[in-house]
Amino acid sequence: MNRTNKLILGAVVLGSALLAGCSSNAKIDQLSSDVQTLSAKVDQLSNDVNAMRSDVQAAKDDAARANQRLDNKVLRICK
């Protein structure tokens, strides 16, 4: 190989390496963005679950009070 061919080959290899590096950085940036989006969704789901827990507890408390009222009425009728 003469000197010109070596320079061209070197330029092609260097250019390919730089393009591959840019592609990898773009992919890393996209993955980072995806991770941030998923983290935000996980936080929102966690907040939703916590809100549901308090709603479920309130429903259980209401059901327990309703059952107690029914039990009291049944006891009065049976007396």
Curated annotation (Swiss-Prot):
Positions carrying N6-murein peptidoglycan lysine: K79
Key words of the record: Cell outer membrane, Cell wall, Coiled coil, Lipoprotein, Membrane, Palmitate, Peptidoglycan-anchor, Repeat, Secreted, Signal
InterPro entries: Lipoprotein_leucine-zipper_dom (IPR006817), MOM_Lpp (IPR016367)
Entry GO terms, CC: cell outer membrane; extracellular region
One of the GO biological process terms: periplasmic space organization
Compartment(s) of residence: Cell outer membrane; Secreted, Cell wall
A GO molecular-function annotation: peptidoglycan binding
Keyword Signal: yes
Entry-linked Gene3D superfamilies: 1.20.5.190
Coiled-coil region list: 28-76
Function in brief: A highly abundant outer membrane lipoprotein that controls the distance between the inner and outer membranes. The only protein known to be covalently linked to the peptidoglycan network (PGN). Also non-covalently binds the PGN. The link between the cell outer membrane and PGN contributes to maintenance of the structural and functional integrity of the cell envelope, and maintains the correct distance between the PGN and the outer membrane.
NCBIfam families in the cross-refs: Ala_zip_lipo, PRK15396.1
Subunit structure: Homotrimer.
PANTHER family xrefs: MAJOR OUTER MEMBRANE LIPOPROTEIN LPP, MAJOR OUTER MEMBRANE PROLIPOPROTEIN LPP
Protein name, UniProt field: Major outer membrane lipoprotein Lpp 3
Gene name of this polypeptide: lpp3
